[in-house]
Amino acid sequence: MASRIVQQQQARGEAVVGGGKQQKKNGVADGRNRKALGDIGNLANVRGVVDAKPNRPITRSFGAQLLANAQAAAAADNSKRQACANVAGPPAVANEGVAVAKRAAPKPVSKKVIVKPKPSEKVTDIDASPDKKEVLKDKKKEGDANPKKKSQHTLTSVLTARSKAACGITNKPKEQIIDIDASDVDNELAAVEYIDDIYKFYKLVENESRPHDYIGSQPEINERMRAILVDWLIDVHTKFELSLETLYLTINIIDRFLAVKTVPRRELQLVGISAMLMASKYEEIWPPEVNDFVCLSDRAYTHEHILTMEKTILNKLEWTLTVPTPLVFLVRFIKASVPDQELDNMAHFLSELGMMNYATLMYCPSMVAASAVLAARCTLNKAPFWNETLKLHTGYSQEQLMDCARLLVGFYSTLENGKLRVVYRKYSDPQKGAVAVLPPAKFLLPEGSASQHS
């Protein structure tokens, strides 16, 4: 047998000595394929670089020269194109098929090198791979497809704005609502936490205790007699120095009782006395005694008459005396108006005028109170006459209150020449600001009524 020739493996970078047979290229030996390992510098081919057969064996010095040339070419290409490039080279193969690393300097950790852009240039990512560049292009397309919306004035908006300006319609800023309870936060008696719920409840139940139109069912009583009785009771209330709550509750009791019971004319004053006695017991700390009312009536009624009528009224009203009167709402609405003392006196003056006249029974207590505030602001020329704060707390707009406000101003304009002058004298006092002597807001009245009263 022929002896087997053992060929020594060629050392890296050395030529074959002895003229042995050359092995296959690209590292193919003994019919086996060997993959280039990534951790020894053998990287994938760069696009556009064609493998070429070396003309001579690659020694270490020759490999260093090739490496320097490759680095210079890559640097020149990067400076011209300003693009990302992979500087790794393909593996070089010796004549005997041993792979030799044709590579640049050891590959550094992948970092993004940002070139400071000029005003007309864009930032380029030098280390971006082709796949990464495609991703960046896709993101750029998405960004171009969804640009940030900029506020631009279209032709339609410009024309609309000009039309509004020509018609006198402008977008006025919304009026701020004043917190009327801010000053009472530390006042436990003000019950700021519950005040809104309390007045919502009052608005819900105010119609339950509201008397209906009863004059038609009273054969011996008319509106004039009722006005005389209320005028006299206001005088008695002033002499006894009772609270306003007592006065308003007295009138409420009278109207509710007359709505369910027919009363002869001779007992009308007795009903008023008994109603004030009950209201005084309910509201006052030191109410007047029964004998005081006997003396006020010039002994027209006895002690027993007053107590008997008191029981009759309580039975008819089913002992219900806790009701929302116009005063309950008036106090709140005056506070919402941010008033001075003059406005406070004027609103109370107009409210008592309304209480004295039967025609105001057609309106609920909250509307009478709100209309008194509106009429007072108009009389004193407090601009604006109505605002968002008043609208919020009253629940009424200015248009909804105009009919009732005109009614109150009408009573005011005829008061000076009328015979029932107790309210006029009361609010002509300097302690009340003498608001009764001020001219009424006749511009609220219809033209015919204004000329008639003037």
Curated annotation (Swiss-Prot):
InterPro entries: Cyclin (IPR039361), Cyclin-like_dom (IPR013763), Cyclin-like_sf (IPR036915), Cyclin_A/B-like (IPR046965), Cyclin_C-dom (IPR004367), Cyclin_N (IPR006671), Cyclins_cyclin-box (IPR048258)
Entry GO terms, CC: cyclin-dependent protein kinase holoenzyme complex; cytoplasm; nucleus
Biological process terms in GO annotation: cell division; G1/S transition of mitotic cell cycle
Region (Disordered): 1-35, 108-155
GO molecular function (one): cyclin-dependent protein serine/threonine kinase regulator activity
Keyword annotations: Cell cycle, Cell division, Cyclin, Mitosis
Composition bias type Basic and acidic residues, residue spans: 118-147
UniProt feature, compositional bias: Polar residues: 1-11
Domain of life: Eukaryota
UniProt keyword Cell division present: yes
Gene3D superfamilies from the UniProt entry: Cyclin-like
Family membership: Belongs to the cyclin family. Cyclin AB subfamily.
Function, in words: Essential for the control of the cell cycle at the G2/M (mitosis) transition.
Subunit structure: Interacts with the CDC2 protein kinase to form a serine/threonine kinase holoenzyme complex also known as maturation promoting factor (MPF). The cyclin subunit imparts substrate specificity to the complex.
The name this protein goes by in its record: G2/mitotic-specific cyclin S13-6
Species assigned in the record: Glycine max
